[in-house]
Amino acid sequence: MANKFTREYKLVVVGGGGVGKSCLTIQLIQGHFLDEYDPTIEDSYRKQCTIDNEVALLDILDTAGQEEYSAMREQYMRTGEGFLLVFAINSRESFEEIRIYQQQILRVKDRDSFPMIIVGNKYDLRGERVVSEQEGQALAAEFGTKYIETSAKTQHNVENAFYDLVREIRKEDKKLGEKVGGTSFANNNGAVKQMDVGDEDVQAGCCAKCIMM
């Protein structure tokens, strides 16, 4: 086994209620689809993986989409390093909310741009689509971000969405001249840990869940 430094990436999944944020996260972490909708308050998950031959520890915060929890948004927006902006392609309202999330993130970060990916979820329901792929791409171009369509049910592009966000954070690190940094949602004691990582460990994932009441 060789010692390697493992970078932790603080990813935040945001979007309106019922768009499939939790389903995307659970599909990535545990490899199964949630059949029943149970509104999330705030859940945190961790997964170790390899992206472009580099080991990464994903620290993923799955957030509440319901309006009654909107007061919590600025707290996680301050600490996130990258954001998945999720809407459902069969919901025009959820698509229109993406701009609100993007503007709030930039305001909290006091930045003109920040690592984000726009995600059009529920691709398996594309027969009920009310938001075209072209509209999603146009909004992403306006924001200077990528657009990807996913299905938590069929696993379509689920890994790609999260992994592309990590790639965007790496680009930001390089642009800012940062080698490593950040903290963890799970323990807040530092983002970079020296770990013994072997070939058999690289694909292993771990999950820790906590609900903030």
Swiss-Prot record:
InterPro entries named among the record's database cross-references: P-loop_NTPase, Small_GTP-bd, Small_GTPase, Small_GTPase_Ras-type
Bilayer topology annotation: Lipid-anchor
Biological processes, Gene Ontology terms: signal transduction
Gene Ontology MF terms in the entry: G protein activity; GDP binding; GTP binding; GTPase activity
Residue(s) carrying Cysteine methyl ester: C210
Disulfide bonds: none
Catalytic activity: GTP + H2O = GDP + phosphate + H(+)
EC nos: 3.6.5.2
Major enzyme class: hydrolase
Membrane-spanning residues: none
CDD domains hit by this protein: H_N_K_Ras_like (cd04138)
Positions with a binding annotation for GTP: 15-22, 62-66, 121-124
UniProt keyword annotations, A-Z: Cell membrane, GTP-binding, Hydrolase, Lipoprotein, Membrane, Methylation, Nucleotide-binding, Prenylation
Motif (Effector region): 37-45
Sites of S-farnesyl cysteine lipidation: C210
Gene3D superfamilies, alphabetized: P-loop containing nucleotide triphosphate hydrolases (3.40.50.300)
Domain of life: Eukaryota
Subcellular location: Cell membrane
Propeptide intervals in chain numbering: 211-213
Record function comment: Ras proteins bind GDP/GTP and possess intrinsic GTPase activity.
Protein family: Belongs to the small GTPase superfamily. Ras family.
Record's protein name: Protein ras-1
Organism expressing this protein natively: Neurospora crassa (strain ATCC 24698 / 74-OR23-1A / CBS 708.71 / DSM 1257 / FGSC 987)
Highest classification ranks of the organism: Eukaryota, Fungi, Dikarya, Ascomycota, Pezizomycotina
